[in-house]
């Protein structure tokens, strides 16, 4: 049977050494962090398994890292898998029956579980038991298997795609938000120390401002800036060195990359600022709809460059200004700017 969990390092874990190991080391998400600390301490004091946890929010904000930290703070085992990997109900049953008492089972992209697998998960989460059908036809019978006390930690970028029965079984829903520049400066400073890279405060701020409020992107940009600085012979990464490297990576002052600018330019040039539907944009950009909705749009919405309306996506005045273009005559921005 194909391994459902991933015990070896994957490409996504290339920065595993930079990840915080405890809640105290974790930067940002202050309210979520404090609540988790309280829930973990309470569960340990009672001697119970922590209630099931759901992390949701845009990609790259630390959902997987927090799941690992939860297991480490509880002092229990950690097993990791993802929704698309669990193809059959039997796959999930195999995972659950191999858990030890108190273990944390992390399911990334939990919104992509199939309905059949999800049905198995309900009694497992609620009653710590599995209901399995044995046999077929008139002779089929249901057998209940007791499971160890465990904590399911789910992660999703699309909370709205979770079914209500599944969502309601998570006792601890935790929303993760984009990071501030100050928080990202701390993330970058810590990562630079671990990488042995000398970085000036203004250099860390320059990278932070272009990291789209996302620690994963901040770490990736920091490593690329390190490469440019090493080849250029910079002993310390200051704002000037960071700016030069990021410009070569085509990451602009707002943190937008080439794909973001293609998205904005398409709405501006072809659709006169919108509204335009997401399926049309996906076809024009040759990108899946999920990429548009999960990767490109959240940050553009966060910084106010675009708006989602019932009729489709539209550009706000700040987007026209960033592109260096004037809204077409008769557009909403053009009317309200007068």
Swiss-Prot record:
- Residues reported to bind Mg(2+): 64
Q: Which GO terms describe its biological process?
A: DNA recombination; DNA repair
Matching InterPro entries:
AAA+_ATPase, AAA_lid_4, DNA_helicase_Holl-junc_RuvB, P-loop_NTPase, RuvB-like_N, RuvB_C, WH-like_DNA-bd_sf, WH_DNA-bd_sf
- The EC number(s) attached to this protein equal 3.6.4.-
Where does the record place the region Large ATPase domain (RuvB-L)? 1-179
Where does the record say this protein resides?
Cytoplasm
Q: Which residues bind DNA?
A: 289, 308, 313
Instruction: List GO molecular-function terms, semicolon-separated.
Output: ATP binding; ATP hydrolysis activity; four-way junction DNA binding; four-way junction helicase activity
Principal localization? cytoplasm
Start and end residues of each stretch annotated as Head domain (RuvB-H): 253-338
Q: Where does ATP bind?
A: 18-19, 60, 63-65, 169, 179, 216
Sorted UniProt keywords? ATP-binding, Cytoplasm, DNA damage, DNA recombination, DNA repair, DNA-binding, Hydrolase, Nucleotide-binding
- Catalytic reaction annotation: ATP + H2O = ADP + phosphate + H(+)
What CDD domains does the entry give? Answer: AAA
**Region entry Small ATPAse domain (RuvB-S), spans:** 180-250
Claim: DNA repair is one of the keywords in the record: yes
Return any one Pfam family short name. Answer: RuvB_C
Kindly list the GO CC terms recorded for this protein.
cytoplasm; Holliday junction resolvase complex
Q: What does this protein do?
A: The RuvA-RuvB-RuvC complex processes Holliday junction (HJ) DNA during genetic recombination and DNA repair, while the RuvA-RuvB complex plays an important role in the rescue of blocked DNA replication forks via replication fork reversal (RFR). RuvA specifically binds to HJ cruciform DNA, conferring on it an open structure. The RuvB hexamer acts as an ATP-dependent pump, pulling dsDNA into and through the RuvAB complex. RuvB forms 2 homohexamers on either side of HJ DNA bound by 1 or 2 RuvA tetramers; 4 subunits per hexamer contact DNA at a time.
Family per UniProt?
Answer: Belongs to the RuvB family.
Provide the assembly information: Homohexamer. Forms an RuvA(8)-RuvB(12)-Holliday junction (HJ) complex. HJ DNA is sandwiched between 2 RuvA tetramers; dsDNA enters through RuvA and exits via RuvB. An RuvB hexamer assembles on each DNA strand where it exits the tetramer. Each RuvB hexamer is contacted by two RuvA subunits (via domain III) on 2 adjacent RuvB subunits; this complex drives branch migration. In the full resolvosome a probable DNA-RuvA(4)-RuvB(12)-RuvC(2) complex forms which resolves the HJ.
Note what the entry says on domains. Answer: Has 3 domains, the large (RuvB-L) and small ATPase (RuvB-S) domains and the C-terminal head (RuvB-H) domain. The head domain binds DNA, while the ATPase domains jointly bind ATP, ADP or are empty depending on the state of the subunit in the translocation cycle. During a single DNA translocation step the structure of each domain remains the same, but their relative positions change.
Q: Read off the HAMAP family from this record.
A: DNA_HJ_migration_RuvB
- Do you know which NCBIfam families this protein is assigned to? PRK00080.1, ruvB
Q: What is this protein called?
A: Holliday junction branch migration complex subunit RuvB
Which gene name belongs to this protein? ruvB
């Amino acid at each position: 049977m194909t391994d459902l969990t991933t015990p070896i390092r994957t490409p996504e874990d290339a920065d595993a050494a930079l990840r915080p190991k405890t809640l105290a080391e974790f930067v940002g998400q202050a309210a979520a962090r404090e609540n988790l600390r309280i829930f973990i301490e309470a569960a340990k004091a009672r001697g119970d398994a922590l209630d099931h946890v759901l992390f949701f929010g845009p990609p790259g904000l630390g959902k997987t890292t927090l799941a690992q930290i939860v297991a480490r703070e509880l002092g229990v085992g950690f097993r990791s898998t993802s929704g698309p990997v669990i193809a059959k109900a039997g796959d999930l049953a195999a995972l659950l029956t191999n858990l030890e008492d108190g273990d944390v089972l992390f399911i990334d992209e939990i919104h992509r579980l199939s309905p059949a697998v999800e049905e198995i998960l309900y009694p497992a989460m609620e009653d710590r038991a599995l209901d399995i059908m044995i046999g077929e036809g008139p002779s089929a019978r249901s057998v209940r298997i007791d499971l160890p006390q465990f904590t399911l930690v789910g992660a999703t970028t699309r909370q709205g795609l979770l079914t209500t029965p599944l969502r309601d079984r998570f006792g601890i829903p935790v929303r993760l938000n984009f990071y501030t520049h100050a928080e990202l400066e701390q993330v970058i400073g810590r990562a630079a120390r671990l990488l042995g890279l000398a970085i000036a405060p203004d250099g860390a701020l320059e990278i932070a401002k272009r990291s789209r409020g996302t620690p994963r992107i901040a770490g990736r940009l920091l490593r690329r800036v390190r490469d440019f600085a090493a080849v250029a012979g910079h002993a310390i990464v200051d704002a000037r060195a960071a700016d030069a490297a990021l410009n070569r990576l085509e990451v602009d002052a707002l943190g937008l990359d080439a794909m973001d600018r293609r998205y904005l330019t398409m709405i501006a040039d072809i659709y006169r600022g919108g509204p335009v539907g997401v399926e049309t944009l996906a076809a024009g950009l040759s990108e899946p709809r999920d990429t548009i909705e999960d990767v490109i749009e959240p940050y553009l919405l966060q910084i106010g460059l675009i708006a989602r309306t019932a009729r489709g996506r539209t550009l706000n005045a700040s987007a026209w200004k960033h592109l260096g273009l004037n809204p077409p005559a008769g557009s909403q921005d053009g009317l309200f700017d007068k």
